[in-house]
Curated annotation (Swiss-Prot):
PROSITE patterns registered for this protein in UniProt: AA_TRNA_LIGASE_II (PS50862)
Gene3D superfamilies cross-referenced by the UniProt entry: Anticodon-binding domain, Bira Bifunctional Protein, Domain 2
InterPro entries, A to Z: aa-tRNA-synth_II (IPR006195), aa-tRNA-synth_II/BPL/LPL (IPR045864), Anticodon-bd (IPR004154), Anticodon-bd_dom_sf (IPR036621), His-tRNA-ligase (IPR015807), HisRS-like_core (IPR041715), HisRS/HisZ (IPR004516), HisRS_anticodon (IPR033656)
Family indicated by similarity: Belongs to the class-II aminoacyl-tRNA synthetase family.
Record protein name field: Histidine--tRNA ligase
Record GO terms (molecular function): ATP binding; catalytic activity, acting on a protein; histidine-tRNA ligase activity; transferase activity
Gene transcribed to yield this protein: hisS
SUPFAM superfamilies to which the protein is assigned, alphabetical: Class II aaRS ABD-related, Class II aaRS and biotin synthetases
Summary of subunit composition and partner proteins: Homodimer.
Entry EC no(s): 6.1.1.21
Catalytic activity: tRNA(His) + L-histidine + ATP = L-histidyl-tRNA(His) + AMP + diphosphate + H(+)
Provenance organism: Streptococcus gordonii (strain Challis / ATCC 35105 / BCRC 15272 / CH1 / DL1 / V288)
Length: 426
C-alpha cells in the first residue's frame, strides 16, 4: 500500500506555510486592535456540543461530521466549526463571572473537519479564523464585528469585497416568519429537491439558501423576513444599518440569506468577493443571543464570525496579492574541509545567539554548490571558513547582493556581527 495523506487533506510545505503564517499574524494584529484575546479549544468535542448547538437537522450534523465512539464509549466528534466549542469553553470556565471584564472578546484559529466533497479552497480538514464577543446586546457590537472583518480584508489587500446583510429577528419574529414560509412552501413541496422537502418539515428557513435550481425557483416569490419583524427586531436591524452607514461600510440586504447554523438571531452577514467571475464567500457570521444559556450558562448575548484560511489564501492568490514574506537568511557559512567543521558549528551558533538567522553547510560539498545554496536561501551574506581561515583567525564576509567583501577576525563575528554587517553596507 502506498502511504498518502487522506482524501480532503493537504500538506502545507514550508514556502506555502510562510504565507499561512503571514495571514494568521495579520489577523492577530487586527484582533489586537479591537482588544480580542486568543482562545484555544480541543479539536474534538463531545458530540452533543455540536449537534445540539449547530442543530440536529443541519447538513453539518446529518451529513458532514466526523464522529466516533472512543475507547470509553464516549460519543466524540471532530469540531466542524469554531463557535460552539468557544461557547462551551466560555460556560465551562465561567467567563461570565462578575470579575471577568465585559464584553468578553475572543478569537481563535485552528483546524475544523467536515466530510464533504473536496474542492478548491474547501477541504475535509480546513482551517478557520474566527472571533466571538460575549456580553453585549448593543447593535454597535454587531457593527464593530463587521467593521473588524472589513478592515482585515481591506488592509491585507483583498478587493471587490461585498457585504450581504440580513436579520432573523428575535425568537418571536423568527417563529412568525417560519410559519409564513411553511404556508408558502407547502403547496410547492413536490417541486422541491429531496433535501428541501426534508428541510421543509424540520427547518424551513434552510430552503431559502439551497443551491438546487428547483429550490431557487420555488423561493423566488417567498415572503420576506422583513415583513414579519416585530417592533424590537425592526428597531435593532435599523440601528445596525444606520451604524454601518455612519462608518461608510456599504451593504446589500439579502433576505434569502439564513446561514447554515440554527443558533443565529437578529443580525447575520456574509462577505463575498469576486474570483474568476464567481462570487466566493470569505467570511460569515451573526448574532446568537440564546447559545450561552443553551449550554447551561446565564442569559448572555453573543456575536461572532468565521473565515476559512484556505479560501482567503486562494482569493489572495487569484487576485494577485503579493504577500511580503520574509524568507532569507542573514548569513550562510561555507565550510571547506573537515578541520573547519567544529569551528563552523561554533560560529553559526554564535550568530543565532546574537539574533541572526544563519545556516552552514553540513554536506562537505564543493564551494560552488555551497554558494548556490546561499543564493537559494536568499542569504544576505556569505562567510567562508576553511583551513586557511582557521590558521589566520580571519574570515571573509561577503555582501551577497553587492559582492562587497570585508576580512574580519573570527571573534568579531562571534561577538558583534551587526558591526561587521555595517562595514559591507548592511
Amino acid at each position: 500500500m502506498k502511504l498518502q495523506k487522506p482524501k480532503g487533506t493537504q500538506d502545507i510545505l514550508p514556502q506555502e506555510s510562510a504565507k499561512w503564517q503571514y495571514v494568521e499574524e495579520f489577523a492577530r494584529e487586527t484582533f489586537r486592535k479591537y482588544n480580542y484575546a486568543e482562545i484555544r479549544t480541543p479539536i474534538f468535542e463531545h458530540y452533543e456540543v455540536i449537534s445540539r448547538s449547530v442543530g440536529d437537522t443541519t447538513d453539518i450534523v446529518t451529513k458532514e461530521m466526523y464522529d466516533f465512539y472512543d475507547k470509553g464509549d464516549r460519543h466524540i466528534t471532530l469540531r466542524p466549526e469554531g463557535t460552539a466549542p468557544v461557547v462551551r469553553s466560555y460556560v465551562e470556565n465561567k467567563l461570565f463571572a462578575p470579575e471577568v471584564q465585559k464584553p468578553v472578546k475572543l478569537y481563535y484559529m485552528g483546524s475544523m473537519f467536515r466530510y464533504e466533497r473536496p474542492q478548491a479552497g474547501r477541504l475535509r480538514e480546513f482551517h478557520q479564523i474566527g472571533a466571538e464577543c460575549f456580553g453585549s446586546s448593543n447593535p454597535a457590537t454587531d457593527v464593530e464585528m463587521i467593521a473588524m472583518a472589513a478592515q482585515f480584508f481591506k488592509e491585507i489587500g483583498i478587493t471587490n469585497v461585498s457585504l450581504e446583510l440580513n436579520t432573523l429577528g428575535n425568537p418571536e419574529s423568527r417563529a412568525a416568519y417560519r410559519q409564513a414560509l411553511i404556508d408558502y412552501l407547502t403547496p410547492l413541496k413536490a417541486s422541491l429537491s429531496a433535501d428541501s422537502q426534508r428541510r421543509l418539515e424540520e427547518n424551513p428557513l434552510r430552503v431559502l439558501d439551497s443551491k438546487e435550481p428547483e429550490d431557487k425557483v420555488a423561493v423566488e416569490g417567498a415572503p420576506s423576513i422583513l415583513d414579519y419583524l416585530d417592533e424590537e427586531s425592526s428597531a435593532y436591524f435599523a440601528a445596525v444599518r444606520s451604524m454601518l452607514e455612519t462608518l461608510q461600510i456599504p451593504y446589500v440586504i439579502n433576505t434569502n440569506m439564513v446561514r447554515g447554523l440554527d443558533y443565529y438571531n437578529h443580525t447575520i452577514f456574509e462577505f463575498t468577493t469576486e474570483v474568476a467571475g464567481s462570487q466566493l464567500t470569505i467570511c460569515a457570521g451573526g448574532r446568537y443571543d440564546g447559545l450561552v444559556a443553551y449550554f447551561g450558562g446565564p442569559e448572555t448575548p453573543g456575536v461572532g464570525f468565521g473565515m476559512g484560511l484556505e479560501r482567503l489564501l486562494l482569493v489572495l492568490d487569484k487576485q494577485g496579492v503579493e504577500l511580503p514574506i520574509e524568507m532569507g537568511l542573514d548569513a550562510y557559512i561555507a565550510v571547506l574541509g573537515a578541520g573547519a567543521n567544529g569551528k563552523a558549528l561554533e560560529l553559526v551558533q554564535s550568530l543565532r545567539a546574537q539574533g541572526f538567522a544563519a545556516e552552514r553547510d553540513y554536506l562537505d560539498r564543493k564551494i560552488k554548490a555551497q554558494f548556490k545554496s546561499a543564493d537559494i536561501f536568499q542569504a544576505k551574506t556569505i562567510i567562508t571558513l576553511g583551513e586557511s581561515e582557521l590558521e589566520s583567525g580571519e574570515l571573509t564576509v561577503k555582501n551577497n547582493v553587492t559582492r562587497q567583501e570585508v576580512t574580519v577576525a573570527f571573534e568579531a563575528i562571534k561577538t558583534d556581527f551587526q558591526g561587521v554587517l555595517a562595514q559591507i553596507g548592511l
